[in-house]
């Protein structure tokens, strides 16, 4: 039996089979979980096609985390497939073009607000939408995907600020929902060549930094180590870990300039 045997997991953010979210869903299934995916808008048809590449094709529910109606009906839709949730994966992030690329001082509030709403506040929104489904006596684990926000990265700009907000949001959720045995942890992955990464100006600069400085060899085309960490955090191996950031970045976060 796998480490997620008998567990039900909701995974957001699956868009291509190169994404970390896809590999979380794949590894979770291989470890025994039943997986439900979310997507929305024009991406729905893409996610449904990609779902067929999983070991077991997973249902895809529509969810825009900025849409209150979608959030309100999420638990009802999930119950059509599984009776409860043991794990939730937050793989959601977006910043308008004006909030990236070295334009930090000139970015206007509406663009900043969009980045923070979609990338950070949505962790709280998604959690509260799923909370009625966290009924297992063993509690539930919410895992988010992060990019280290301890430092200011070139051209990452307001997305870096949004990731810092995500990290803080995770800690406050861990504080407030720990008494209900709901855990919150983030996986801070190194750069991975995903569709989302392609939209970040200067992504190649991240790759060169990792190639030259990370103690462990880093492969920007391999999302599996980050996916395995996320799955482990939803397993019985981490029942007393919450409010934590697990770095899966080849160790670069620990190295000075």
Placement of each model-derived feature along the sequence:
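Canonical Rossmann dinucleotide-binding motif of NAD(H)/NADP(H)-dependent dehydrogenases/reductases
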Residues: 2-37
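Hydrophobic structural elements of the Rossmann-like NAD(P)H-binding subdomain
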Residues: 11, 89, 143, 184-187, ...
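Catalytic loop of short-chain dehydrogenase/reductase
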Residues: 13-22, 93-131, 135-179, 191-194, ...
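A glycine/serine/threonine-rich, flexible loop-to-helix segment
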Residues: 50, 158, 179, 191-215, ...
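Rossmann-fold cofactor-recognition segment
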Residues: 51-69
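Conserved Rossmann-fold cofactor-binding substructure of NAD(P)-dependent oxidoreductases
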Residues: 66-81
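Short-chain dehydrogenase/reductase
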Residues: 75, 123, 127, 170-171, ...
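C-terminal helical subdomain
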Residues: 121, 179, 186, 205-241, ...
């Amino acid at each position: 039996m796998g480490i997620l045997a008998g567990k039900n997991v909701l995974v957001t953010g699956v868009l291509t089979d190169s994404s970390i979210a896809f590999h979380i869903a794949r590894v979770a299934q291989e470890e025994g979980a039943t997986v439900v995916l979310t997507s929305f808008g024009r991406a729905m048809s893409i996610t449904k096609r990609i779902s067929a590449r999983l070991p077991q094709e997973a249902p895809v529910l529509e969810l825009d985390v900025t849409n209150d109606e979608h959030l309100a009906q999420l638990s009802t839709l999930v119950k059509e497939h599984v009776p409860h949730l043991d794990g939730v994966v937050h793989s959601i992030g977006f910043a308008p073009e004006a909030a990236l690329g070295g334009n930090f001082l000139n970015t206007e509030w509406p663009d900043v607000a969009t980045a923070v709403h979609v990338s950070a506040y949505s962790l709280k929104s998604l959690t509260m939408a799923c909370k009625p489904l966290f009924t297992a006596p063993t509690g539930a684990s919410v895992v988010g995907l992060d990019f280290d926000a301890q430092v200011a990265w070139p051209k990452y700009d307001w997305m870096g600020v949004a990731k810092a907000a995500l990290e803080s949001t995770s800690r406050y959720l861990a504080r407030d929902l720990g008494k209900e045995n709901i855990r919150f942890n983030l996986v801070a992955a190194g750069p991975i060549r995903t569709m989302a990464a392609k939209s970040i100006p200067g992504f190649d600069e991240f790759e060169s930094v990792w190639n030259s400085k990370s103690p462990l060899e880093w492969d920007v085309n391999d999302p599996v180590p980050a996916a395995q960490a996320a799955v482990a955090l939803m397993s019985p191996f981490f029942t007393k870990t919450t409010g934590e950031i697990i770095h899966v970045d080849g160790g670069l976060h620990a190295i000075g300039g």
